[in-house]
Every structure is written in C-alpha cells, then in structure tokens.
Amino acid sequence: MLGKYTAKNDKDPDGNPHGGTVVGLGINIEWQKGPLGTGMARKEPNGAFVETVIDAARQRIQFYQDSKFKCRENAIAITKLEEALMWLNKRTAGRDARGVEGTHEK
C-alpha cells in the first residue's frame, strides 16, 4: 500500500541538491545536505542517502520473503531494489574513478 507523504527537495544557491525531507506515517527522512568532500576534508554524513533508504526497503521485503508471506512478487521487488543499488554503486564507482566523488563536480 502506498501511503501519503510529503517531500521537500532543497537546493543550494548554485542549484545543487542540498538536503530536504520526506515525512509520512512512519517515515521521517532528512536527506544529506551538501557534498561530503574528499581526502582529509571529507566530512561525516549529516543526512540520509538514497542508497540507504533503498536498502532499508529491500531488507524489509526480504523479512516478508523469509516468512509465510514469501511470493514471486516479493522476489521480483527485491531483485529490482538490488538492481537499483547496483546502478547507484556503479555511478559512485565512476565518480571515484574520475576523482569527483564527494563533490558537486560532474
């Protein structure tokens, strides 16, 4: 069941993603504000990352899949969430290889 939620996506003065929120029944997400930086200047996260939220949903569906509610649809949903994580990790690896991970550079 898709519940109602409100989302607010914030931008910095340059138009870059800069945090935001998602709030609904049982949900209260505060997104990462700004880049983490690189090297010695790398900061601790101050908010959630999309990958973490996707993985949290994946583990919950896996919980159902490991119970009497096991079904084909759950298995497919898990696969698709794992695929989403794979693509996001591929993006991060590419950014690492280009030396721009943790920055607003492309």
Residue ranges and their predicted role:
Residues N46-F63:
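Short acidic, glycine/tyrosine-flanked loop/strand segments centered on an H-E-D-like triad
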Residues Y64-G102:
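Short, compact, well-ordered microdomains
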Residues G37-G39, Q62, D96:
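Residues in flexible loops and secondary-structure boundaries
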Residues M1-F49, H104-K106:
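Long, non-catalytic architectural segments outside compact domain cores
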Residues I27-I29, I54, I61, I76-I78:
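Weak global preference for isoleucine
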Residues D10-D14, D55, D66, D96:
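Acidic-enriched, low-complexity/disordered segments with a strong bias for Aspartate over Glutamate
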